[in-house]
């Protein structure tokens, strides 16, 4: 039985990571634009709370983000970040062009939102995992996912050289999907992503950084950097205390790039 809190429109399951920041961002935008209400519930994956019976009822895939929509007669669960973005955008008729009147624009936005989940997110996430959370050095994995991160960054920079926003001429869920990962570049040159190498991405960042909801996400990311702890996550993959407490296998800044 899904726990209900009738005081809010949505229950949002999060752990303050890139994929969950996408959903927090659209919820903040909808809070301002449509006066929706939501409650955040933190799922601590280092304590394996995502495997709890309660959470598995929400998402059988055992991952965040997920939301429970309580605005209807019965609570309705949506999981997978881009699925949530599309669901909310369609429900409130915002951040996604209407298919009936603008089918091509609608398709462009959805394509770039799905592109993020299928390409940018996996490349960034896997490279970051093998850089900081892997108990041992995996050189092949590091180079493979670094090269893929460089490829998707170059592709996105090319896209933004001809389009003000990722999905077209207006801010959309395509931007929200990528923002969950790319807002980190405001604080550190992760993946060697600098303004000199990817000027159009940073121009886009300057543009969306002006939004109030984005400012709030940036604040959360800034606070997260202060408490970054690879050891806690490494403990999910090994019981060896030496590996858990070892220095990260390789620093982001030391990776050899092949797409300079």
UniProtKB/Swiss-Prot annotation:
One Pfam family of this chain: GST_C
Top-rank taxon: Eukaryota
Residues annotated as domain GST C-terminal: 102-233
Domain GST N-terminal, residue spans: 7-96
UniProt GO MF annotations: glutathione transferase activity
InterPro entries: Glutathione-S-Trfase_C-like, Glutathione-S-Trfase_C_sf, Glutathione_S-Trfase, Glutathione_S-Trfase_N, GST_C, Thioredoxin-like_sf
Cellular component terms per the entry's GO annotation: cytoplasm
Family in the record: Belongs to the GST superfamily.
Protein name: Glutathione S-transferase domain-containing protein DDB_G0274223
